[in-house]
């Protein structure tokens, strides 16, 4: 797909995606680049994976750089935004994708696990949004990452993760009000099961007696959750993010959009 034939043109825009070295984040970064945006690929640990995403974006004709930062640390989030603006001269789109998954019965969740999950999924996203507001150009876009388990789809032993994402739905409603003075829209996407390496690592938790099935069998079973009878893939999420990032998506504001093919 060329920029001229793309549904949404992001040429001249600068986008930053946290946690974009792999999975959904990588797909978002690449799709933003495909639509013409210059992209900052953020990663916490694997520089090699992030550089592969950068190379793919550059092969599409868009500029891209990788910047390391652990967004659990607010000081690193500030540095990430500062470096992005210093390199590209401005910032128009911030997508907060970095997150962790967690499973555990209420009676077994430790304080350490609670802090691990909320420090990134909730606190981390809050301060990514704060710094995005401070750094974005007027008319920018903030897109956070929720989950269909936050509001539509209940999974046993998943309260910690679901709660950490449920806060995001509340954040975006209020952030949209706070960011109106800069004409910045704030939304979240709430994916359902999406086939990534993380999906394969935890899919047995979502399917009753899931440990009895192979990863391929679990993926086939998960496809039946949607009336469209297929799995969700990272590109499905990326396309919705790109719509929200575009000028066509301006009138969607303060919302969390479930992207799960009707599974929940």
Swiss-Prot record:
SUPFAM superfamilies assigned: NAD(P)-binding Rossmann-fold domains
Binding site for NADP(+): 24, 70, 97, 130, 161, 165, 196
EC number assigned by the record: 1.3.1.-
InterPro entries, sorted: NAD(P)-bd_dom_sf, Sc_DH/Rdtase_CS, SDR_fam
Designated gene of the protein: AacuN
Claim: Cytoplasm is one of the keywords in the record: no
UniProt-recorded name of the protein: Short chain dehydrogenase/reductase AacuN
Catalytic activity: 3,8,9,10-tetrahydroxy-6-methyl-1,4-dihydroanthracen-1-one + NADPH + H(+) = (3R)-3,8,9,10-tetrahydroxy-6-methyl-1,2,3,4-tetrahydroanthracen-1-one + NADP(+)
GO biological process, one term: secondary metabolite biosynthetic process
